[in-house]
Amino acid sequence: MAIERYFIKEGVREMLIDEYLEKELRRAGYGGIDIKKTPLGTKVIIFAANPGYVIGRGGRRIRELTRILERQFGLENPQIEVEEIKNPYLNAKVQAVRLAQALERGVHFRRAAYAAIRAIMRNGARGVEIRISGKLTGERAKSVRFYQGYLAKVGNPAETLVSKGYAQALLKLGVIGVKVSIMPPDAKLPDEIEVIEKPIQEEEVSEE
């Protein structure tokens, strides 16, 4: 049980760090983190479309982030590395954040989702799914799913091959959740299938 509690605690801490960095580094095209324990402390890799923004002028921002990770989140001797995201359109976290930003600017959720899917597919994705949930058009909360192409949904391919990202948009009607899943062009499936090109699909779904 002690080991289970440790992993739960570490998982919660990583989630809180991810949420904090998403807010602080939105302008950097924040795409997630990877935290690993090392003999010298804690290695933190920050994925971003604009690494220069994360580093800051003269390294000022990255030094401040290091202090916050150590003092506020309790990481032992954090060593931050910044890795550039070569194609932000294939990073689900980046796309979820950008979609949330579009909603906060007042772009209609359907228009924002269709534009995102078209851009993602143009950049070579094999498939993409976007779920937008909350009070989208009125008082009743609902969830709308948009998708195109092929996306592994279960098993090992869904866990290892699909890029997944989540973000929130703060609107007058309340919080809107945005979940993006992307199957990248280089995903190798155990049983290769032929995907018939279809237009973007849309459906209202019940919350699970």
From Swiss-Prot:
Lineage top rank: taxon: Archaea
GO biological process, one term: translation
Keyword Transport found: no
GO cellular component: cytosolic small ribosomal subunit
Keyword set includes Zinc: no
KH type-2 domain mapped to chain residues: 17-86
InterPro entries referenced in this protein's UniProt entry, alphabetically: KH_dom (IPR004087), KH_dom-like_a/b (IPR015946), KH_dom_type_2 (IPR004044), KH_sf_prok-type (IPR009019), Ribosomal_S3_C_sf (IPR036419), Ribosomal_uS3_arc (IPR027488), Ribosomal_uS3_C (IPR001351), Ribosomal_uS3_euk/arc (IPR005703)
Residue ranges that the Swiss-Prot or TrEMBL entry lists as coiled coil: none
GO-annotated molecular function: rRNA binding; structural constituent of ribosome
SMART domains the UniProt entry points to: KH
Keywords: Ribonucleoprotein, Ribosomal protein, RNA-binding, rRNA-binding
Recorded family membership: Belongs to the universal ribosomal protein uS3 family.
Assembly: Part of the 30S ribosomal subunit.
Protein name per Swiss-Prot or TrEMBL: Small ribosomal subunit protein uS3
Annotated source species: Thermococcus onnurineus (strain NA1)
Designated gene of the protein: rps3
